[in-house]
């Protein structure tokens, strides 16, 4: 018991533990497990952003090799870069924040209503999937006014540029016990 507490203190001394970083609102299940696996396999941010490790690839073969290897090696880091870009996009767009608030507010109201009694519309019981579709339909005009479509494409484009640039220009690290194979041209 004491050894387990010492290990937990050591992990917290290194940084925030995965359980404190994950929001309590994410329910237990596949999504939470996936996010915990991503958090557990994240590479050190120091080596991820080390400026001395960036250089121009010598040829197209090296570029392709870097892209494949870095995307595989830094996959979890890239997921968090993507999530950071989404957060940046939402925070810097007040109308998108309003649209998200309307959508999640409608979902929350429907959730509270189903706790009290079943939702009946025109004499028929409405399933939870249809209720959330109704919430999406109600909030759709707000998303349209907020320019959510352009925000989605901005996030995708920015992600491709940032991750693609990093993967192309970051030098490949030799993994323990594995050396790079050079083929003659």
From Swiss-Prot:
Record has Cell membrane as a keyword: yes
Ranges in the topological domain labelled Cytoplasmic: 1-78, 113-131, 166-185
Protein known as: Prenylated Rab acceptor protein 1
Region (Required for interaction with prenylated RAB3A and VAMP2): 30-54, 175-185
InterPro entries: Prenylated_rab_accept_PRA1
Entry function: General Rab protein regulator required for vesicle formation from the Golgi complex. May control vesicle docking and fusion by mediating the action of Rab GTPases to the SNARE complexes. In addition it inhibits the removal of Rab GTPases from the membrane by GDI1.
Region (Required for interaction with GDI1): 165-185
GO cellular component: Golgi apparatus; plasma membrane; synaptic vesicle
Complexes and interactors: Homodimer. Interacts with VAMP2 (synaptobrevin-2), prenylated Rab proteins, GDI1, NRDG1 and PCLO.
Keywords of the record: Cell membrane, Cytoplasm, Cytoplasmic vesicle, Golgi apparatus, Membrane, Synapse, Transmembrane, Transmembrane helix
Organism in which the protein naturally occurs: Sus scrofa
TM annotation in the entry: 79-94, 95-112, 132-148, 149-165
Subcellular location: Cell membrane; Cytoplasm; Golgi apparatus; Cytoplasmic vesicle, Secretory vesicle, Synaptic vesicle
Family classification: Belongs to the PRA1 family.
Residue numbers spanned by region Homodimerization: 175-185
Membrane topology label: Multi-pass membrane protein
């Amino acid at each position: 018991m004491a050894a387990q507490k010492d290990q937990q203190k050591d992990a917290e001394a290194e940084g925030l533990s995965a359980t404190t970083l994950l929001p309590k609102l994410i329910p237990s299940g596949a999504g939470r497990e996936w996010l915990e696996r991503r958090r557990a396999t994240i590479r050190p941010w120091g080596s991820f952003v080390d400026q001395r490790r960036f250089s121009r690839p010598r040829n197209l073969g090296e570029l392709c090799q870097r892209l494949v290897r870095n995307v595989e090696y830094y996959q979890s880091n890239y997921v968090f870069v993507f999530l950071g870009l989404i957060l940046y996009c939402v925070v810097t767009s007040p109308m998108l924040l309003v649209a998200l608030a309307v959508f999640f507010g409608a979902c929350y109201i429907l959730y509270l209503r189903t706790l009290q009694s079943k939702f009946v519309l025109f004499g028929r019981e409405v399933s939870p999937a249809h209720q959330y579709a109704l919430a999406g339909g109600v909030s759709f005009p707000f998303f349209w006014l907020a320019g959510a479509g352009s925000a989605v494409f901005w996030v995708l484009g920015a992600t491709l540029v940032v991750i693609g640039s990093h993967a192309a220009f970051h030098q490949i690290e030799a993994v323990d016990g594995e050396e790079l194979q050079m083929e003659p041209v």
